[in-house]
Amino acid sequence: MSKNNFRDDFEKNRQSINSDDQFEDNTNEFDENSNESNDFDNQSDQQFPPRNAQRRQRRRNQATNKNRKFGNQNSDSNANGSLDDRHDEDSFNELQHNQQENHLDNEPIHKDDKLSSEKDFNNDASRRNNRHEASNRKHDKDYDNGSLNDDDRHRRNHEEGIDERQDNRNHKDQQNKKSRHGKDAAIAGGAGVAGAAGAKAAKDKRKKDEHHDSKYNEHKDDRDLNNDNQFDQNRKHDKDLHDDHRDAKDNHSKEEPKKGNKGKKAAVGAGAAGAAGAAGVAAAKHKKDHKNNNHKDNHSHNRDHQDDHRNHKHEDGNDGFQAHNGKKKRGLAGILLPLIALLLILAALAIFIGMYLNNDKKDSNQADNKTEQTANKDNNKDSKDKASNDSDKDKASSDKDKDKATNDDDSNDKATTDNDSSNNSSDDNSSSSDNSTSSNSSDNSSSSDNNGNNSNSDNNNGNSQATSNNSSQSNSNNNQSNSSNSGQQTHVVSGNENLYRIAIQYYGEGTVENVNKLKQANGLSSNNISNGQKLIIPQ
């Protein structure tokens, strides 16, 4: 089979991959960065690019760059350790360039690996060994197979073997040109490279352990912060967990030197075997280191799983302990809490009842105040009405008194007028008596003087009797007039008064009948009256 039968148009048209600059950047990061082991482990799962002359040339160039990298460590191992370095560098750079190409092809491979791991688990005796073998087999299969089918893998492996044999022949030619001292240096260089690989593995292991310890410490700190109340109870469990972790770490550290010693022995044997077997031993060493790394990863994963399981149990234990403490505390709490709840309920009820009673009292007081206010208002109204009535009565009485006073004045005036008229009548009577006496004296002049004197005396007596009779009559007339006037009133006209107004004032109504009474009493023929005129007001 020809080497180029395998090519197609896609591979022929591919551009060359010159990754020297990228490799130099990666070597600088490899020396400076503390996480180079994780990067190498992640990139070791990737696949190789297609097999062609460009790839082989790149491998040779990378081998020389790798030798320059390790020149500071050991000058004797630069030329003779190129095979191991070349193999490691190929796996490092080729996996780095094909990371994106094989991302979509990993899912079916993982499914096949899962089936193969389950099959190996049923056939092996120990669960841990079977799990390690399944993981190692998975990574070997990812490393060897890629996304090609079985025929392509067979052809690729065949071409890879041809390339490796050709490289070995070239390397043998170079080795034959050198002296035996160069061969011894190659053996020492191979041993040094193996030791460096072992040291690197130990360093990676220490870093992983430190990373795991930091994770564990962070988890423990968080757990201590969340469980401050159960610090005394958790301290014992944390101590046991730390002891178990330390024992597991010690056991793992005991297993690692053995594996490292095996790797060193294999490297020394590879150096002694010569240039022809160096490639095979290097491949075996790489696979073995790959398995050891997988074993370490699986062991750390199992250890993390155990820690998580223990933490889960510990948290369950804490929950149970808290529940147990809750049951212990529930004795007093079960007694006190209901009592406190009852007291609070009773206090609330008492407060509401007091507020209700106070509101009722306030309402009743307000109602009483309202009734008192209304009663006071009614009393005030009654008193005002009484006062107004009293004032009206007083006014009426004062008016009556005034009317009586005016009537008395009128009666007194009438009495004076009557007395005047009686005096006039008495004067008339006296004059008439004088005339009679004169006539009598003239008639009786012819009589004697004695008779004349007797007659004069008799006349005087008669006159006195007459005057007495007249006075008695006048007095009787005055008494009659006073008695008659006592039932009547007088009114002096003033201003613009008329009979209608006077009738309204004394009778309450200005009717025609009342006006006629006034006319008849006063002898008036018309309604005309003058100011200052006195009118008699009949009853």
From Swiss-Prot:
Residues 70-81 have a biased composition (Polar residues). Residues 1-324, 362-491 are annotated as: Disordered. Residues 489-537 form the LysM domain. Residues 53-69 have a biased composition (Basic residues). Keywords: Cell membrane, Membrane, Transmembrane, Transmembrane helix. InterPro entries: LysM_dom, LysM_dom_sf. GO terms for cellular component: plasma membrane. PROSITE patterns: LYSM. Residues 1-14, 100-176, 210-226, 233-259, 291-317, 362-371, 378-417 have a biased composition (Basic and acidic residues). It is found in: Cell membrane. It is a single-pass membrane protein. Its main location: membrane. Signal peptide: none annotated. Residues 21-34 have a biased composition (Acidic residues). Residues 35-52, 266-283, 418-490 have a biased composition (Low complexity). It comes from the Bacteria. The chain crosses the membrane at residues 335-355. SMART domains: LysM (SM00257). CDD domains: LysM. NCBIfam families: elast_bind_EbpS. This is Probable elastin-binding protein EbpS. It comes from Staphylococcus haemolyticus (strain JCSC1435).
